Amino acid sequence: MDLDHIITSKQLSRADIETVLDRAAEIDADPSAFADRYENTVLGLLFFEPSTRTKMSFDTAMKRLGGDIVDMGSVDSSSVKKGETLADTVRVIEGYADALVLRHPNQGAAQMASEFVDVPLLNAGDGAGHHPTQTLLDLYTIRENAGLEDLTIGIMGDLKYGRTVHSLSRALTNFDVDQHFISPESLQLPRDVVYDLEQESGTRVREHDSFEDVLPELDILYVTRIQRERFPDENEYQKVAGEYQLTATHLEAAKDDLTIMHPLPRVDEIAPEIDDTDHAAYFEQAHNGVPVRMALLDLVLSADGGVDDE
């Protein structure tokens, strides 16, 4: 794996993905073997948007590797409030850190920022663009529950603005899976994502406006929330809010071994009654963020002159 920055899942080959997932499995099996590998190594966290799981799991991952973090904190308490540009911010903070993690509301921000720094930069979400590290933990969760071959996967919810969807759907083209996309017409996959899937990867894009008909076929159902904060018009959000609500009754038509995933946070798209069923994997999915991000940091930092891979 030879990547200076992790910006989109399109960068990642099947071999790259398997390298990260295999390393994550090693960490899961024996975390102590990776403790203190990166003593005196510092990870810079630059989050221009709210985050719970991504930010805390990167923080935990770096500390469990023996390193530490520097955190820009909220935008309101940083020099961004004074008008500092993103380019200047990352140039300054790379002087304090050995790698950077960036979340930003603007699509393309991570790519732009990476052009101004020499340390590795990992995209933790750029608006409605990409979220490649979430994709890696999603793939790890899928592999742990169902393998990554000969699967039928449904992806449901906000497919237009959902960066987790854009990244995951592209990464899945590296594996033998059928993908079904379930959304209101107004929230269908962006045409550039459809182009990547169909024209560049040869993936058939199957679009549905209801999940009931396709549910019995699915091995994995990946649910996303309707993202209120991405809508330019509140009235447009209200038209689709609550469009899909998965309940235990729906699961009577599903396969016994269906795995239900969600990048979280959820609103009302998965009923709490599903949480304690064998289908629910979304909390496991969130917890997988730590070993997967430990694996990614280990591989990126070692490639950048840290600990050599054995």
From Swiss-Prot:
GO cellular component: cytoplasm
PROSITE patterns: CARBAMOYLTRANSFERASE (PS00097)
Binding residues annotated for carbamoyl phosphate, in chain numbering: 53-54, 103, 131, 134, 264-265
This protein's UniProt keywords: Plasmid, Pyrimidine biosynthesis, Transferase
Pfam families hit by this protein: OTCace (PF00185), OTCace_N (PF02729)
Reactions that this protein is recorded to catalyse: carbamoyl phosphate + L-aspartate = N-carbamoyl-L-aspartate + phosphate + H(+)
Enzyme class per UniProt: transferase
Protein's GO biological process: 'de novo' pyrimidine nucleobase biosynthetic process; 'de novo' UMP biosynthetic process; glutamine metabolic process
Binding positions (L-aspartate): 82, 163, 225
Molecular functions per Gene Ontology: amino acid binding; aspartate carbamoyltransferase activity
Pathway: Pyrimidine metabolism; UMP biosynthesis via de novo pathway; (S)-dihydroorotate from bicarbonate: step 2/3
Enzyme Commission (EC) number: 2.1.3.2
Subunit structure: Heterooligomer of catalytic and regulatory chains.
Task of the protein: Catalyzes the condensation of carbamoyl phosphate and aspartate to form carbamoyl aspartate and inorganic phosphate, the committed step in the de novo pyrimidine nucleotide biosynthesis pathway.
NCBIfam families to which the protein is assigned, alphabetical: asp_carb_tr, PRK00856.1
Protein family (similarity comment): Belongs to the aspartate/ornithine carbamoyltransferase superfamily. ATCase family.
Protein name: Aspartate carbamoyltransferase catalytic subunit
Species of the source: Halobacterium salinarum (strain ATCC 700922 / JCM 11081 / NRC-1) (Halobacterium halobium)
